[in-house]
């Protein structure tokens, strides 16, 4: 197993359909501009309430990716 060094970014994804989709939205967006994504950690979950019901989910994730070179 080789040694790795990871860079971590923190992102917040959102979705009206649930937590899992909010996470997937954050990871998909990160994948558009970052390479070598390796893992994520959910660090916060929030929701927006409207009319007494959950209207929207927000999930903050830390995303780790390996650095190129070296």
Curated annotation (Swiss-Prot):
Gene3D superfamilies xrefs: Flavin-binding protein dodecin (3.30.1660.10)
Protein name: Dodecin
Gene Ontology molecular functions: nucleotide binding
Protein family according to the UniProt entry: Belongs to the dodecin family.
PANTHER family listed in its UniProt record: CALCIUM DODECIN
Superkingdom, taxonomy of origin: Bacteria
Binding locations of riboflavin: 39, 46, 58
Assembly information from the UniProt record: Homododecamer; 12 subunits assemble to form a hollow sphere.
Protein keywords: Flavoprotein, Nucleotide-binding
Protein role: May function as a riboflavin storage protein that binds and sequesters riboflavin, thereby protecting cells against undesirable reactions mediated by free riboflavin. Protects bound flavin against light damage; flavin fluorescence is rapidly quenched by interaction with Trp-39.
Record organism: Halorhodospira halophila (strain DSM 244 / SL1) (Ectothiorhodospira halophila (strain DSM 244 / SL1))
Keyword Flavoprotein: yes
């Amino acid at each position: 197993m080789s040694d790795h060094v990871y860079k971590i970014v923190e992102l917040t994804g959102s979705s009206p359909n649930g937590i899992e989709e909010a996470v997937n939205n954050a990871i998909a967006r990160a994948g558009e501009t970052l390479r070598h994504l390796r893992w994520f950690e959910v660090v916060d979950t929030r929701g927006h309430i409207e009319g007494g019901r959950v209207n929207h989910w927000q999930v903050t994730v830390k995303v780790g990716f390996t650095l190129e070179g070296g």
